[in-house]
Amino acid sequence: MKFFALFIYRPVATILLSVAITLCGILGFRMLPVAPLPQVDFPVIMVSASLPGASPETMASSVATPLERSLGRIAGVSEMTSSSSLGSTRIILQFDFDRDINGAARDVQAAINAAQSLLPSGMPSRPTYRKANPSDAPIMILTLTSDTYSQGELYDFASTQLAPTISQIDGVGDVDVGGSSLPAVRVGLNPQALFNQGVSLDDVRTAISNANVRKPQGVLEDGTHRWQIQTNDELKTAAEYQPLIIHYNNGGAVRLGDVATVTDSVQDVRNAGMTNAKPAILLMIRKLPEANIIQTVDSIRARLPELQSTIPAAIDLQIAQDRSPTIRASLEEVEQTLIISVALVILVVFLFLRSGRATIIPAVAVPVSLIGTFAAMYLCGFSLNNLSLMALTIATGFVVDDAIVVLENIARHLEAGMKPLQAALQGTREVGFTVLSMSLSLVAVFLPLLLMGGLPGRLLREFAVTLSVAIGISLLVSLTLTPMMCGWMLKASKPREQKRLRGFGRMLVALQQGYGKSLKWVLNHTRLVGVVLLGTIALNIWLYISIPKTFFPEQDTGVLMGGIQADQSISFQAMRGKLQDFMKIIRDDPAVDNVTGFTGGSRVNSGMMFITLKPRGERSETAQQIIDRLRVKLAKEPGANLFLMAVQDIRVGGRQSNASYQYTLLSDDLAALREWEPKIRKKLATLPELADVNSDQQDNGAEMNLVYDRDTMARLGIDVQAANSLLNNAFGQRQISTIYQPMNQYKVVMEVDPRYTQDISALEKMFVINNEGKAIPLSYFAKWQPANAPLSVNHQGLSAASTISFNLPTGKSLSDASAAIDRAMTQLGVPSTVRGSFAGTAQVFQETMNSQVILIIAAIATVYIVLGILYESYVHPLTILSTLPSAGVGALLALELFNAPFSLIALIGIMLLIGIVKKNAIMMVDFALEAQRHGNLTPQEAIFQACLLRFRPIMMTTLAALFGALPLVLSGGDGSELRQPLGITIVGGLVMSQLLTLYTTPVVYLFFDRLRLRFSRKPKQTVTE
């Protein structure tokens, strides 16, 4: 009592304490960063290596494998995947959550150094690494377009000036430039002209290499002066290479222009980028794993004027895609929902108390508790995100509960004629333990969440801590500020009601009287209530097993990402046409605002597209509905598929795929993997639970297999090296020389002019100069025939891997899909040499599914322990926890009614219900025990009186929690797919719980009291210990 009196009789100190809490919260709010979700990105590092011209199999065996063996020894690597394609290898290392990305980067560099001696000597550069996840969607895409400059020149500006500057901005992890390649001088050779002049391709290569050198020439000095020697040893443009003499034939000079077309072009012509219908260079910016997306985007935007000033005015630099607007809009929606929740909760208090003066008290207590939470959030390193703001929205109903319980009890004493200060002290003393029990037991619900590991634990931690802090501050406020305000603001007389509120008061009285009559009947028919209670427990189990489940609600972020997968033998020209066709289909959709895409590089049969949808207010369909509509149109395009998926704020894993979920096949037997993967993929494609089934196994590319006749080669004076060099010179876009410029280095690229390589007959025009100087056609010593070859080779760990990706059709859940895949694998009889497992988000879903029931049981057990300690009883916690089955049934039925799968967000709702619904029982049990101890009442009389006496605060607290969650259910706009499952779960659980626990709790209380008496050593004792 002294504790309460300290604050009740010292109003100035109490007010200043509350002001201090509020000011700290305001200061913390202003410094909190903004993010879509808590920081849950896995530390990811990408290692890249190249060996131009090497086949995917060569890259996998000679480059990827040595690097994987060295990188796999690094501590904290949770997943290692690699993909090797023509001339390049990319290895993705995913680390444990607690691994520092900078320390991991140092270990990666050390591992690369250790493997260096095992790598091929012909690699043009050492392997490099980047601290970014290539499978993440870019946080921003910039485009460069121009009517004046060529694509190569635009690429040069992007890669030389813009990308390095952007990479230095805090939070930026990687800037990937696509759509073309660096400028180059391209030498397109005419095979027939070469043959006529007796010039080999090696002759051309050697002549160009020798004519373009950059070597130090030294200095000249005399007694007084010093001169640096400079020569015209470099050729920089196509016009300078054109007259270069490469050979003499019968005394006549053969110039490069006589046997080749020399142009100023780009290093790799097999690249294309577009924005809407215009050729463009794309700068795809990804953030560091630990970076804040909003802060990073804002920093980039702040530098854009400076970046624009560094490039010519004829180049248009535009933002094609920006993730931040939808994130900001989503957070604004949550903030509005929070304000509405506060207003509704205060309205509930006003209706029940029917006094403006009394309503002011919770109207002050709620903001103080919520605002003060921001200070703790800042100290914990949290952010303003959807989950933390949802925690505060839900906390509105919780924090007002404490104030309501105290206020209502004090108001009851005032209505009985007690003086205000005395009523404040007496009323607070009576319910102080009740408020403490409710708050501590509610916080106890979240202890298992705080101990939960992995991505779900990291994701829920901010929610749990934020809500717990809000409840803790609310507990302090309700026992200090609330009784002080009651003592000094409320009057001893019964408050005057407005005429419009008298009807509500009479309705409440009638409702209480009706409840009393029905409760008497229930207490006389306890067996029926027991059957109902057991039925709800069984119904909980059945509903949980049968309800569709998923990991996280599908978000509508306003951004779609698409992967193009074409026939494996498609040419680059045809692939570029497919990109244009797909972009036109998407651009014509009324819901699309902007579309960018690119294709080319080492995988000519694939491409990527990034689609920005119009804001939610300007379109009626969700992202998934738009995808469903576009899927029908895109399916009509022959020879290629475009798989669309909505970009999510949570993506697990580093392997790039064309769909949201992955199922990975592993095998140490590559032949077995290549045999079974098509069978499994075709089977999965028939399942109605899956959509957009595709695979990264690309083992059916067209190959022209040349077989050398070594005996003939020896007789003709030709070695294999010369023959291979011929093919590389002719068809490999071989970089044969370097042009040095002040800002960058450019290449001279040699190949047979594409005009002469339109079909297989181009091989017949190739020849080698033998050791006698004679031109020997390739067909003299080699035969060729078409064959199949892999376009890529994938590993996971050190095993061969193939990942099958899939999306979910509308109306299907991830649990449906995973169960269907497991059944299909069993039906196919896949051998033990091929192992299948879910990857990425689907893998985390499997792990979460296995721990959900354990987590709920742990939460219930923790609450039981806390209540047992508080009540010094084994029995009363069971009475209080008997309220949970009805809440579970209500929550699961509500999810079924709204066709919402059981997700991680719904699990949060279930955990919250464990904390919410037991409050009713706590208020009943506390007053029943008090009545038995001091009122000499029988258990039945005590619990009956407690139920009637606490009916008004029970209704107030339940309706406050319900109205606090109702805006989450009714909210629309950005981010509503995250808010609605939480609101649906809580509202459904509260409604069902309120209908049943007002009757089941008294019955359970009496049951355990009789049970206690039966086994008690003191049967005559009537007051519960």
UniProtKB/Swiss-Prot annotation:
Q: Name one GO molecular function term.
A: xenobiotic transmembrane transporter activity
UniProt cross-references to Gene3D superfamilies, sorted A to Z = Multidrug efflux transporter AcrB pore domain (3.30.70.1440), Multidrug efflux transporter AcrB pore domain like (3.30.70.1320), Multidrug efflux transporter AcrB TolC docking domain, DN and DC subdomains (3.30.2090.10), Multidrug efflux transporter AcrB transmembrane domain (1.20.1640.10)
Q: What induces it?
A: The mdtABC operon is transcriptionally activated by BaeR.
Q: Which UniProt keywords apply?
A: Cell inner membrane, Cell membrane, Membrane, Transmembrane, Transmembrane helix, Transport
Q: Name one Pfam family in it.
A: ACR_tran
- Chief location: membrane
Q: Name one GO cellular component term.
A: plasma membrane
- Can you say where in the cell this protein is located? Cell inner membrane
Query: What is this protein for, i.e. what is its function?
Result: The MdtABC tripartite complex confers resistance against novobiocin and deoxycholate.
Q: How does it assemble?
A: Part of a tripartite efflux system composed of MdtA, MdtB and MdtC. MdtC forms a heteromultimer with MdtB.
Protein name per UniProt: Multidrug resistance protein MdtC
Q: Which organism is it from?
A: Escherichia coli (strain SMS-3-5 / SECEC)
